[in-house]
């Protein structure tokens, strides 16, 4: 769209949706996955969001206490406003989503938040 090339060695995790901007149909290869990773402080939150199909996981890193991350899990089809955290009712699904999230973070070479000693805090399955 802007006519700018992608720098060598730069990972692009996305797909061309130019057609949608022009009023066209959704791409045939549309993915039902979405990763948003923010390993920096923003109002106290360091987080990764992983959506796969109807499920959405939000993983909160805790640089002050890295051994104590938090997670929330939603079924967006049944709960589009994210009112009901299912992470304790569906721990198997929460762990599955965390494993998928870790795989995608590793695949894209994502940076992890660091603790106050500068040590990376990778997500853990719990």
Model region roles, listed by residue range:
Residues 52, 62-63, 67-70, 76-126:
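Long, internal low-complexity/basic segments
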Residues 2-76, 126:
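C-terminal cap/loop subdomain of S1 sulfatases and analogous C-terminal strand-loop tails that border
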């Amino acid at each position: 769209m802007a006519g700018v090339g992608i720098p060598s060695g730069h990972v692009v995790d996305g797909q061309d949706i130019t057609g949608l901007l022009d009023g066209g149909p959704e791409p045939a290869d549309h993915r039902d996955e979405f990763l948003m990773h923010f390993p920096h402080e923003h109002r106290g939150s360091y987080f990764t969001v992983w959506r796969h199909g109807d499920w959405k996981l939000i993983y909160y890193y805790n640089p002050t206490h890295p051994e104590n991350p938090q997670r929330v899990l939603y079924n967006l089809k049944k709960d589009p406003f994210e009112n009901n955290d299912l992470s304790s009712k569906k721990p198997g699904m929460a762990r599955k989503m965390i494993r998928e999230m870790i795989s995608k973070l590793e695949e894209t070479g994502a940076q992890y938040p660091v603790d106050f000693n500068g040590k990376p805090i990778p997500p853990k399955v719990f």
